[in-house]
């Protein structure tokens, strides 16, 4: 895994940081555990109601709108969780706190630093967790961030800037950008990380105004 090449534009420091992000694409407040075991998952009382395709319009202050097609057939629990949080207004006013040009932009943390989430965690819908999910982490994919534990994803998500298929099978992709990829490009190009993990200073974090779901 350490020998994979992730893109010609990557600087050496970013390359190293990406390896770290493989284990820390979230950093939830719960204690991280060694991957490989399935953990107890806090789930909604209601059953999954999103079985097909829905759309999410992610409006980002000063940048514009990113429209994402969510695949409820490939990752039903993940899509249901994202839709519920969006419709509840959970994401309104939150930010993208970690941005790595050529890799991804990550947001959806109420703490704004990679340590927070919602009041629930969900099942990791990916092959390493025993669940088939054929969506690949190509440019424009949206996927769930998580801690080391497979079932630790909560509210944090990331949008892939450039192909990052080394994530396939270990993270739950659940859709793709259909419009507004130039917004992702602009955000990634404007970002000025404070470290090799892509951390963005709080005052410089792009703000999610709202996420609107269209079914």
Predicted stretch roles:
Residues 6, 16-17, 37:
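Generic short amphipathic/hydrophobic targeting helices enriched at N-termini
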């Amino acid at each position: 895994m350490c020998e994979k090449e992730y893109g010609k534009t990557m600087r050496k420091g970013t390359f190293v940081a990406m390896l770290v992000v493989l284990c820390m694409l979230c950093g939830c407040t719960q204690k991280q555990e060694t991957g490989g075991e399935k953990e107890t998952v806090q789930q909604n009382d209601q059953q999954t109601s999103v079985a097909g395709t829905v759309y999410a319009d992610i409006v980002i202050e000063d940048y514009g709108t990113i429209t994402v097609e969510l695949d409820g057939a490939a990752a039903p629990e993940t899509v249901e969780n994202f839709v519920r949080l969006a419709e509840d207004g959970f994401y309104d006013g939150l930010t993208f706190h970690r941005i790595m040009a050529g890799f991804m932009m990550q947001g959806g943390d109420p703490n704004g630093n990679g340590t927070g989430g919602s009041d629930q965690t969900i099942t990791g819908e990916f092959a390493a967790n025993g669940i088939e999910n054929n969506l690949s982490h190509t440019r424009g994919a949206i996927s769930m961030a998580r801690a080391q534990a497979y079932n630790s994803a909560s509210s944090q998500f990331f949008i892939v800037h450039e192909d990052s298929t080394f994530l396939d099978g270990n993270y739950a992709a659940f859709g793709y950008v259909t419009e507004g990829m130039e917004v992702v490009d602009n955000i990634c190009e404007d970002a000025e990380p404070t470290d090799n993990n892509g951390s963005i200073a709080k005052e410089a974090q792009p703000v999610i105004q709202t996420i609107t779901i269209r079914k």
